[in-house]
Structures are given as structure tokens and as C-alpha cells.
Amino acid sequence: MFGKQGIRCARKGDERNIKIIVNRVNSERNIKSIGICSPSYPGTFHYQKRYKRGVEFLQNKGFTIVEGNLTGKEGYRGEISGGVQDRAEELNQLIPRVDVIMTSIGGYNSNSVLKYIDYDLFKQKSPIFIGYSDTTALALALYKKTGCITYLSQSVISNFGEFEPFNELNYFYFDFMLQSKCETLMVQIPDVWTDEWINWETYERTKKTNKNEWIIFNKGEFNGTLIGGNIDTIVGIIGTEYMPKITEDTILLLEDVYTDLGRLYRNFTTLALHGIFDKIGGLIISKFETIGENSDVINDIINEFVGHRKIPILLNFDCGHTHPSCLMPIGGKITLSLS
């Protein structure tokens, strides 16, 4: 089923061989307020201590926090934060009130609210939207319907509710992407990363870290528009009016949590059946959380589905469920240069 292809690793200090350059938008924005919504999982109910840590962390950075009206609620059977209209309305109410809208966490059901979002109001007020995991659906839909650049992949609970040092490392990329005055930014390779699962509620020890490396699968350089996010979520909206068009100008970004080979292979097959891999001009694959010793699976799958394409392909990037997570612009213009 799978073949093999040579790969090349790039470590910290090797940025000259791997360049991801982002043409920034929002460079004149003065971010003062962050609104928090829960369009999918009721994480603010289940992870109250971690949510509070995330809110206090952002407040200590000087931001005014505006909580959506589903904050702290159990929702439907503790699995969905509220009725579909309630979840959509929570986001709609935040649109004119804040500079940034950030989701509390991911989940499984953000695609259900897409037809109830006030896209006209969002385009008019144009707050910065930051999604994570399942809320990839909103990040993609808001970009498709309004043309406004959105961002992945950070959330209040998952990223800023972390204990040190990863809350600060995640914030570095928030600040770097949204508050730098530079017009172009080169994304930096984090020194270390982690996907270790330990107690979210009470600090016991610092998470174990791994020395970081990004991996060149195919060399090349391409300037294009970044589209993508959580692959499981993309499969849930592909072919609908909410999925941005994939063209020869697209640099595709994919990430997920690794559960099993069958599910991952199915999702890549779905994208292939839609002709995605035959169109794109570049590909960035982020680290798959909890993949562990199965990391070679990613290399094999990429080789099968995209190995025939002579396009730049980067593996082991940091934008998704692992820490730290770079913040990347959906709809933004970037340059992917691998040599």
C-alpha cells in the first residue's frame, strides 16, 4: 500500500533551508479585547480551572475578556455546548463587541452552526477570528463567505490554559502573528515541542519536551494562499458552500490528532477523491498529536497521495494540537521555500 521516499530534517538554527514567510494583514490593528465563544464542545464547563487559567493569562497580557453567553454551561448532555441556534448566536453577538474572537476549545460539531452565522455583520466589523481543531470549520467558512483572513490553531483552554512554559510559548506566536508591526514575517522553528497528556487541572510537573525538527519531504519554493486546518473537520465540510476553493494557488495546511491508520487513510483518500492533491502548489503537514512511534505512517501516506507531485512539501510543522502551536493565517499569502 505504501512506498518509501527520502526525507530531510531541519532543526533549530537551520531556518535558511526552511522558510515560511507570511505577508501580514491586520498590521495596523490595536488589539484590546478578546471575545470567547464555544461553538462545539462545552470545555468551559468540563475544564473550569484550565479555562480560568487561560482567561487570567490573557488578562495579564492586557486584554479585556468578553465571555460568550454559553460560558460555563453544560450544554446538551455535556457533549455540545448548546442548541445550534444558541451556539451561532453566541458568536454573532460577539462580532460587533470585540477585536478578536477566539474559541474556548475544539470539539466535533462546529460545522452545524455555519448556516446561522451573520456573515454580513462579520464582514462589516471584521474582528479577527482564531479557531482550533474542530473550529477549523468556522475559520474556513468565515474566510470563504467574507474574504476576511482568519487564523489557526489556538484556543483559550488548550493553549493559554497550559502551564508554563507552553502558555508563554503559544502566546509568542499569537503576539508574533497578530501584533508585530512588520509587513512580512518568517515563522520560526520552536526549540522544543510536546504532546504529552498530563493532568490539566493541577500542576504536577512540566511536560516532557522533544527536540524540534521540521522535515523536508520535497524541495521547492511556492508563493500562494494558505488554506487548511484540521483534516477531520475539512472532510466534514468539503464540497459545501463553506469550503474555500482549492486551486493551483493553494498551499494546503493539514493537522489532526492521530487515532488510527484507517481513519487517517480514509481522510486523505477523501481529499484525493475531491482532486485536492492534484491542484495544490504546496503542502504543509503539522505534527499529529499522540502519533508517537507511528510517525512514519505520515511519510508513507504523503508519498502515496502526493509523492508524484513536484511541489514543496514540509512535514512535522507546529500548528495544531501539539505545543507550541504557531498561529497561521487562513486566506493569507505565504511563501514556502524548502532547499
Predicted regions and their residues:
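Internal helical hairpin/lid segments
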Residues: 235-293, 297
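Short, acidic/small-residue loops that bind anionic groups at enzyme active sites
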Residues: 119-145, 149-156, 309-313
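Short Gly/Thr/Asp-enriched flexible loops that form oxyanion-binding sites at enzyme active sites
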Residues: 106-124, 140-143, 297-298
